[in-house]
């Protein structure tokens, strides 16, 4: 367990909330619990007191008391993070994770690459918007059509998405209806209901799903990864993630957000994501 000194009131007031929300959202859709570790490495700091052994230990009563004091009520602000999942021809789908700590909400919105949106007084598929104006165009289309104000973006191709999911042990996913998919690429059979899915099965389920189902899957992924055990593995997760994607989120962004992300993972009063139709992105 990290030193209790890390969570002093002085430190909590000094960090920039904006960077926390961006990092927090990142670990939400996929997925790596970031840490200050790499940033410290780059400065040759001694981090022995910041991160302990990877060996599993049993929490003491004192540790449990500290953990139970963490609360998301200390956090505030709002940010929208964009994920673009590419295929050979352009966009497979995009996902926005909109986090608002002021009203304790987290909204997941997916848009298929073939979906038509209003863009510059025209109706275009979001894939066409991406080919025409790249990330800037996609951000404008999402703002005009859904009122999302994207702060940062992450771009993954399908293979990179699969690699990111494989960083985790698996996910507790609510399968919305029976699945019996057979194609040249892969077969997938699932029974309706909540169940544990491997990273590979989760990836396949995402690939064959519509927007509403994708949103539900991603919400379940978020719930599975924003937990204390993954907060303790942040160094390897961070390294693997940034090696798999294109993003405008810097190592410093992660470093300045690590403490609050850690607090959220241990908080007993955390809120959870909802699909776009159920939530409110205002």
Residue ranges and their predicted role:
Residues 2-20, 24-282:
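Non-catalytic, solvent-exposed segments at the cell envelope interface
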């Amino acid at each position: 367990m990290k030193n209790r000194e890390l969570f002093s009131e002085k430190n909590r007031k000094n960090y920039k909330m904006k960077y926390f929300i961006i990092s927090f959202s990142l670990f939400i859709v996929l997925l790596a619990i970031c840490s200050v570790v790499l940033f410290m490495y780059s400065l040759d700091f001694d981090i022995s007191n910041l991160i302990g052994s990877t060996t599993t230990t049993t929490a003491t009563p004192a540790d449990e008391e500290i953990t139970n004091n963490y609360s998301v009520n200390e956090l505030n602000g709002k940010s929208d993070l964009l994920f673009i999942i590419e295929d050979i021809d352009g966009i497979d789908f995009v996902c926005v994770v909109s986090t608002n700590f002021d009203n304790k909400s987290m909204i997941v919105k997916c848009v298929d690459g073939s979906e038509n949106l209003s863009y510059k007084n025209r109706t275009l598929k979001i894939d066409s918007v991406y080919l025409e104006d790249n990330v800037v165009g996609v951000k404008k289309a999402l703002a005009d059509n859904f009122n999302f104000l994207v702060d940062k973006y992450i771009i993954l191709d399908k293979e990179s998405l699969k690699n990111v999911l494989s960083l985790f042990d698996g996910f507790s996913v609510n399968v919305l209806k029976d699945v019996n998919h057979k194609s040249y690429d892969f077969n997938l059979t699932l029974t309706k209901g909540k169940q544990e899915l491997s990273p590979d099965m989760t990836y396949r389920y995402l690939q064959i799903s519509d927007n509403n189902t994708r949103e539900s899957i991603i919400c379940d992924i978020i719930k599975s990864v924003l937990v204390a055990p993954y907060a303790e593995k942040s160094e390897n997760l961070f390294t693997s993630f940034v090696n798999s994607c294109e993003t405008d989120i810097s190592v410093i962004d992660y470093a300045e957000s690590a403490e609050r992300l850690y607090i959220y993972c241990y908080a007993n009063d955390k809120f959870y994501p909802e699909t776009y139709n159920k939530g409110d992105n205002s």
